[in-house]
């Protein structure tokens, strides 16, 4: 076999590897889609009998402490807290933890909610880095807004201070830039009422608020963003939550509850020692550690996902900010999977150990590397094919069928799955009612796969490399425009 034959064999073998990987990852998403469809079908059948008003009026409904860690969030903090105080739930408090902001985050809250400094002793059940410097209570209504100011220690440390300060049975963690639908707590707390012994954590859907109409901290009209970057993130979020989280929850393998909206039993959080401060993705790491704790102690615990409650978040509209976000997210995933690698393929951890963890290693952690090298391969193959077609060369090193099959499996398959998420959204919730918004969403599902997806893979790959090199990383300064200002 001469050198050109060896090169041709190697190139075609690489092509078939990328095809096989693409088929496997997209077929696994197809399975998750079918599981999600089954879950939404069950949801549609039971939604009329949910009796959420009974939950609202039941005096024994567990109280919820809403924790909002804030760092330089003055652009939208007041609107976010206003939305929290307007939620329908019989017993809740809002705890804002200002993690040493450099802007006027605390001053905005103190003025807006007529707060007064009070000498509250925050327990130290969970060890924290930052020191509490002051605590404030609102003089309005039922005094259910508490502001805790502390020295900077990072998001996880701020949440741990919030857990210590929480006075309710359940703890709801939300991002400071998030808005919740009025009935969100009723929905996300329902699993705890239905199965109080086994349910230990519950997560809800997070959607992109950019472009929507915001009034008094509430999304009043859902619209697709006009800018291309946030509208692509809309379809990303729909696919991740309506297919990914719902499908994994259906089989008991939910590995991630978004830090933008998740509820946990406080007693379980204290048992776990709060959130880890030595990794970037503290919210996901907490859920993985919870699964590990359940398995190590032979407990019959559940981590569930509820598709109905909605938290709205502001997606980055600046490419540099989005790059930092995606690098941080993938670095967090890399650190988590490395830290808990002992769970992989261990029956003790059930579906999480046997299915979810291996899947995340193969199709989340490694996906950006395969995609980046796949793009390089495709570019080389197209150049060689073009040279042959123009008569510049007659090498025929790459089988043309390999190129077309790779394009079909990697692009068309992905578009179909994204469109499936849009169909699920329309049949189940119908948040986007206008034809214009639906058309924009469909276009965004196509737009995502041409340029954005490949650049995003490059960013994510960089996040893993940062984790493996041990590069120092902090919370970061994520500039926001503020919800309702798009």
Where are these regions (language model features)?
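Long helical/loop segments within the catalytic core of UDP-sugar-dependent glycosyltransferases
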Residues: 118-143, 148-160, 164, 168, ...
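N-terminal signal-anchor transmembrane helix
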Residues: 33-91, 107
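The conserved acidic donor/metal-binding loop of glycosyltransferases
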Residues: 99, 175-179, 278
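Short aromatic/hydrophobic "clamp" motif used to bind/position activated sugar donors
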Residues: 171
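N-terminal membrane-anchoring/stem segments of glycan-assembly enzymes
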Residues: 1-60, 245, 417-420, 456, ...
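A conserved acidic beta->alpha catalytic loop
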Residues: 98-118
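Cell-envelope/extracellular polymer assembly enzymes that use nucleotide-activated donors
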Residues: 62-65, 93, 270, 285
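Membrane-embedded multi-pass helical conduit in multi-pass membrane proteins
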Residues: 36, 359-468
């Amino acid at each position: 076999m001469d050198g050109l034959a060896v090169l041709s064999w190697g190139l075609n073998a690489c092509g078939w590897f990328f095809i096989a990987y693409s088929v496997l990852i997209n077929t696994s998403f197809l399975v998750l889609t079918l599981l999600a469809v089954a879950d939404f079908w069950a949801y549609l059948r039971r939604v009329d009998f949910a009796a959420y008003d009974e939950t609202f009026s039941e005096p024994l409904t567990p109280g919820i402490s809403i924790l909002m860690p804030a760092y330089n969030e003055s652009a939208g903090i007041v609107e976010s807290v206003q939305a929290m105080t307007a939620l329908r739930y019989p017993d809740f408090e809002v705890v804002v933890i200002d993690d040493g902001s450099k802007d006027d985050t605390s001053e905005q809250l103190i003025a807006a909610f007529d707060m007064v400094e009070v000498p509250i002793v925050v327990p130290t059940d969970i060890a924290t880095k930052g020191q509490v410097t002051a605590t404030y209570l609102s003089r309005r209504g039922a005094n259910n807004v508490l502001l805790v100011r502390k020295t900077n220690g990072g998001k996880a440390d701020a949440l741990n201070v919030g857990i210590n300060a929480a006075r309710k049975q359940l703890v709801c963690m939300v991002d400071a830039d998030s808005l919740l639908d009025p009935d969100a707590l009723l929905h996300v707390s329902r699993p705890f009422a239905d199965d109080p012994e086994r349910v230990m954590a519950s997560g809800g859907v997070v959607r992109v608020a950019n472009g929507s109409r915001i009034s008094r901290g509430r999304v009043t009209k859902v619209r697709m963003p006009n800018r291309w970057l946030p509208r692509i993130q809309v379809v990303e979020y729909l696919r991740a939550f309506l297919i990914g989280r719902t499908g994994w929850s259906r089989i008991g393998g939910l590995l991630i509850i978004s830090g933008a909206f998740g509820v946990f039993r406080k007693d379980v959080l204290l048992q776990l020692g709060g959130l880890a401060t030595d990794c970037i993705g503290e919210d996901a790491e907490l859920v993985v550690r919870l699964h590990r704790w359940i398995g190590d102690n032979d407990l019959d615990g559940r981590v569930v996902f509820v598709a109905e409650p909605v938290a709205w978040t502001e997606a980055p509209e600046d490419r540099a900010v989005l790059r930092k976000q995606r690098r941080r997210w993938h670095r967090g995933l890399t650190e988590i999977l490395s830290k808990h690698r002992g769970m992989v393929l261990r029956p003790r951890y059930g579906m999480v150990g046997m299915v979810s963890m291996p899947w995340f290693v193969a199709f989340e952690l490694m996906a950006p590397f395969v995609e980046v090298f796949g793009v390089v391969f495709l570019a080389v193959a197209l150049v060689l094919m073009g040279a042959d077609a123009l008569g510049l060369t007659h090498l025929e090193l790459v089988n043309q069928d390999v190129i077309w099959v790779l394009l079909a499996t990697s692009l068309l398959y992905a578009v179909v799955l994204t469109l499936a998420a849009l169909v699920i959204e329309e049949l189940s919730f119908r948040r986007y009612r206008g034809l214009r918004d639906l058309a924009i969403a469909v276009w965004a599902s196509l737009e995502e796969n041409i340029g954005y997806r490949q650049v995003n893979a490059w960013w994510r790959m960089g996040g893993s490399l940062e984790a493996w090199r041990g590069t120092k990383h902090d919370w970061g300064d994520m500039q926001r425009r503020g919800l309702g200002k798009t």
